């Protein structure tokens, strides 16, 4: 959805920089890893987190490294602000209602001007997690999205990188 005029001036524009995003999360993973490693007594969950750390931390670093100067998302932010591109901010199955052939979206409390692909990312990740990361499902979801709105090369790269990041592991660590 695009906003115009006065609505755009009132809308909050959210800056998103993947390098900062992944870098901050990777530092958090390291901090938690160091904290747990130094503990004398560790519970089963902490031992499992330590055991999996190297694999998921490497995956997180790979996502961070994919974001080079070549893939700078400042222009996606500027484009969102200039064109008033509205993102839901919390687009997931809890906020989607099917009424016959119509789809109704609710709960726009987190809506803001921003990179719209973030909504697809959140919905796709949650749906894929709930369905065992079936690649065919993910491909069909992206193809369905692109029937309405084609992804730019930068958006496609951002989506790939976001999905590469081990978000579930990061959440478990926090």
Task: Write out the residue ranges for each language-model feature.
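Gram-positive cell-envelope targeting signals
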Residues: 1, 40-44, 56, 79, ...
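Internal "kinase-insert"/substrate-recognition segments embedded within catalytic cores
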Residues: 1-9
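ATP-dependent phospho-/nucleotidyl transfer catalytic cores
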Residues: 9-86
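A ubiquitous short alpha-helical element
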Residues: 17-20, 109, 126-130
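Active-site acidic catalytic loop and adjacent metal/ATP-binding pocket
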Residues: 66-118
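Active-site activation/catalytic loop segments of kinase-like enzymes and analogous catalytic loops
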Residues: 117-150, 163-174
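Helix N-cap / loop-to-helix initiation motif
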Residues: 151-155
């Amino acid at each position: 959805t695009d906003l115009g005029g006065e609505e755009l001036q009132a809308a909050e524009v959210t800056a998103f920089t993947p390098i900062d995003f992944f870098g901050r999360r990777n530092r958090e993973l390291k901090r938690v890893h160091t904290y747990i490693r130094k503990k004398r007594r560790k519970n089963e969950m902490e031992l499992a987190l330590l055991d999996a750390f190297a694999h998921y931390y490497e995956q997180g670093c790979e996502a961070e490294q994919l974001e080079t100067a070549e893939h700078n998302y400042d222009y996606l932010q500027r484009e969102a602000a200039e064109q008033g591109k509205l993102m839901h901010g919390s687009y997931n199955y809890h906020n989607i209602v099917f009424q016959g052939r119509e789809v109704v979206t609710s709960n726009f409390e987190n809506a803001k001007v921003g990179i719209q692909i973030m909504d697809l990312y959140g919905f796709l990740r949650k749906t894929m997690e709930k369905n065992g990361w079936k690649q065919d499902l993910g491909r069909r979801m992206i193809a369905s999205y692109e029937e309405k709105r084609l992804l730019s090369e930068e958006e496609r790269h951002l989506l790939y990188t976001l999905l590469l990041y081990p978000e579930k592991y990061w959440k478990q660590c926090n």
